[in-house]
């Protein structure tokens, strides 16, 4: 683990305990006891940012905190569990000009967030606060984290200090875990990474005889492993090595040195006994309490005023709050709601709205040895238990009838929820079980306090937009796993297809306005639009939107005809996927076409099904609770009990997805836009390129199309001239505006961009 050390972390927590006790601060319930503002800085002409730290404590015996894994093993001398969380506030300098709405943003892997200009134009307040306590990569804890006074150079990231679990007798907690090395070449040692950040756990011993290192030639999307062999304990070391310090290198618990070096065509997996698990579930409570403090408290226990408090100290300038998280952070919010954290220990509702963005699962956080940086690669948790909002009995996995909103519904603390996502979340991030469950036999209704918007034919988070006949921006498979070994400059090889440009930006702009109106004024947003088995919207247990809290003074328009909203098997025939698109391997995206094995070209390619990344039902052992994603996993690697059926949206004759919310570039296309791509190098060569989408442009002319045997109509055949294309864009713009998924100012912008483009000029 990155510096500072575990011992230093424990010392910092001890400092907090001593400071609170010496000051005689009350400790009746979980709360923020102290805040320190480290820095103020201007943000434009009328806003400012405040960076600081919040010191908090939790009652481990309170029922709302008891669900935190190992919380009893993280107690300090006063019987409480303590944490330190960084934060940033963005607010009007003149707080009386604030709108009353607080956006509480969840950082992604420590990345600090500042509300955008559109939100500042409304007078909104922004809060970014820490939740991820693994002290790794972007969440590394600074050396001055526990300073009782302002620090000169505060961190630019968000980090959280959480306790290390200790056995009741004070001894070290240990357990078996797993780590992987992928796409590493040469004799230099390999760091153990999760996504692209260091593994947050260290081995209990550097004796390699106490661990098992294996290599493998291949693993399929279904988790089938081939060509596996065990590497002798004398042939590797827990060490850092390079040309100057060859094998066995210098002892280092964070890296593996392999005698003879690493083969980039192999994947390496180590199972070992780790020590000092972090009580990472504290992150749920810390994020809850920091947000609620700034929403409601006048001052901390030491008299430091809440910077959002009213001048007369009669409360704060915050009337409403919306929790928001993107990707990993959106997964955090789904887990946050599922485990009942949208109420504090006094049973008060924390957030009025929750917006998980491009997030289709619950975060892997609240179990021992959790790795929250994971992105659902093989043997990574996150798809266990209910991924759906309403109750559903998971008969396929033998789990009880549950839903994400169970706990908040029982206590009357459920927020309004909007979620949106696109095609990449279907093809790589295992989203479809949220819609149809694990048996894929029926559409799971969504409660009336939830809106779901599917942005079709888009990559993870959307592309860069614009109207370009031949996009050239490369798509790179993310993390350390998929793209292949980096070159001498550290660059990952690009994927087969250029980056999918279809944006989320304009759709998100509209959703933002609708969510504010829903939370602040009770005005209903557009009805949900997403693919279903029946091709129909399924909202509420009885489909009755009239029970929704709020007023609907506009026409709720589905936007896209219902006939397009179908989910089908991920086969070319069922999807209606066109054959013969230039540059695409045959059978993709139904199957991967494997052209090499162990770096050696195959005389005859292998067709491997599926290409999509399915949900794998793992056996994590008897101490793991799959419904809550809590407990202690003991099986490493976990056996795959079964592969869960996966469905995908249908596509049109160009391969673009049908249905979903109207998106201008999808509806006035310049190519085929996919939520998937193909890896071209490294261990996962020829397989799905993680969560990165691609594009295959249309030919410009009919002659060029025929010469390339392209079954798709050319731009010339579709639109005729540049003016014809601008007319098609204007029609798509009008459709999106009518459906309330495009703001008027963005409509004009898109028209102007299309008019100024070089399309068919």
Q: Which stretches of residues belong to each language-model region?
A:
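N-terminal secretory signal peptides that target proteins for export/translocation
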Residues: 1-10
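Long, compositionally biased, charged low-complexity segments
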Residues: 9-13, 705
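C-terminal His-loop and adjacent cap/lid subdomain of alpha/beta-hydrolase
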Residues: 30-761
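Bacterial N-terminal signal peptides
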Residues: 12-23
């Amino acid at each position: 683990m990155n510096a500072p050390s575990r011992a230093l972390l424990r010392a910092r927590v001890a400092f907090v305990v001593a400071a609170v006790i010496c000051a005689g601060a009350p400790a009746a319930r979980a709360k923020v006891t102290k805040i320190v503002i480290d820095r103020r800085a201007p943000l434009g002409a009328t806003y400012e940012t405040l960076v600081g730290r919040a010191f908090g404590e939790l009652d481990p015996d309170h029922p709302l905190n008891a669900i935190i894994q190992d919380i009893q093993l993280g107690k300090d001398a006063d019987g409480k569990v303590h944490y330190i969380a960084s934060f940033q506030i963005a607010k009007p300098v003149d707080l009386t000009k604030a709108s009353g709405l607080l956006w509480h943003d969840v950082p992604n892997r420590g990345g600090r967030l500042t509300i955008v200009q559109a939100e500042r134009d409304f007078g909104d307040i922004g809060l970014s606060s820490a939740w991820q306590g693994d002290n790794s990569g972007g969440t590394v804890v600074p050396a001055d984290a526990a300073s009782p006074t302002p620090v000169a150079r505060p961190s630019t990231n968000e980090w959280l200090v959480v306790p290390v679990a200790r056995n009741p007798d004070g001894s070290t907690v240990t357990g078996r875990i797993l780590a992987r090395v992928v796409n590493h070449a040469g004799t230099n040692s390999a760091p153990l990474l999760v996504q692209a950040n260091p593994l947050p756990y260290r081995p209990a011993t550097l004796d390699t005889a106490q661990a098992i290192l294996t290599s493998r030639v291949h693993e399929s999307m279904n988790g089938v492993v081939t060509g596996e062999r065990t590497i002798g304990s004398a042939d590797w070391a827990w060490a850092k090595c390079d040309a100057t310090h060859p094998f066995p290198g210098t002892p280092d618990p964070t890296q593996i040195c392999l005698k003879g070096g690493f083969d980039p065509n192999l994947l390496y997996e180590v199972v070992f006994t780790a020590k000092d698990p972090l009580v990472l579930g504290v992150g749920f409570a810390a994020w809850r309490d920091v947000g609620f403090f700034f929403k409601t408290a006048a001052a901390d226990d030491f008299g430091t005023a809440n910077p959002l408090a009213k001048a007369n100290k009669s409360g704060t300038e915050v009337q409403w709050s919306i929790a928001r998280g993107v990707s990993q952070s959106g997964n955090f919010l789904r887990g946050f709601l599922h485990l009942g954290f949208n109420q504090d220990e006094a049973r008060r509702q924390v957030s009025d709205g929750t917006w998980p963005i491009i997030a289709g699962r619950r975060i892997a956080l609240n179990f021992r040895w959790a790795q929250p940086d994971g992105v659902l690669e093989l043997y990574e948790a996150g798809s266990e238990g209910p991924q759906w909002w309403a109750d559903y009995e998971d008969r396929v996995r033998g789990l009880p009838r549950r839903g994400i909103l169970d706990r908040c519904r029982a206590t009357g603390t459920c927020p309004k929820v909007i979620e949106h996502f696109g095609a990449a979340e279907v093809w790589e991030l295992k989203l479809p079980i949220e819609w149809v469950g694990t048996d894929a036999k029926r559409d799971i209704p969504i409660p009336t306090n939830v809106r779901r918007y599917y942005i079709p034919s888009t990559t993870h988070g959307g592309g860069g937009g614009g109207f370009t006949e031949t996009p050239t921006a490369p798509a790179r498979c993310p993390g350390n796993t998929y793209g292949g070994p980096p070159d001498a400059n550290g660059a990952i090889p690009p994927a087969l297809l250029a980056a999918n440009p279809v944006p989320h930006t304009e759709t998100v702009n509209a959703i933002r306005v609708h969510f504010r109106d829903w939370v602040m004024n009770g005005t209903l947003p557009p009805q949900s639009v997403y693919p279903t088995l029946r091709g129909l919207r399924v909202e509420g247990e009885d489909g009755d939107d009239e029970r929704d809290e709020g007023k609907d003074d506009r026409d709720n328009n589905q936007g896209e005809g219902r006939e397009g909203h179908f989910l089908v098997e991920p086969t070319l025939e069922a999807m209606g996927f066109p054959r013969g698109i230039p540059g695409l391997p045959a059978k993709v995206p139904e199957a991967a076409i494997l052209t090499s094995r162990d770096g050696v070209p195959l005389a005859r390619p292998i067709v491997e099904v599926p290409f999509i990344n399915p949900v794998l039902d793992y056996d994590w052992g008897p101490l793991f609770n799959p419904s809550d994603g809590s407990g202690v996993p003991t099986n490493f690697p976990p056996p795959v009990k079964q592969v869960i059926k996966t469905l995908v949206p249908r596509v049109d004759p160009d391969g673009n997805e049908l249905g979903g919310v109207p998106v201008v570039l999808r509806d006035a296309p310049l190519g085929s836009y996919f939520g998937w791509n193909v890896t071209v190098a490294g261990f996962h060569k020829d397989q799905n390129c993680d969560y990165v989408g691609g594009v295959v442009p249309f030919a410009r002319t009919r002659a060029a199309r025929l010469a390339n045997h392209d079954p798709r109509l050319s731009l010339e055949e579709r639109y005729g001239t540049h003016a014809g294309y601008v007319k098609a864009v204007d029609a798509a713009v009008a459709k999106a505006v009518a459906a309330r998924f495009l703001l008027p100012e963005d409509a004009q912008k898109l028209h102007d961009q299309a008019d100024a483009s070089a399309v068919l000029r």
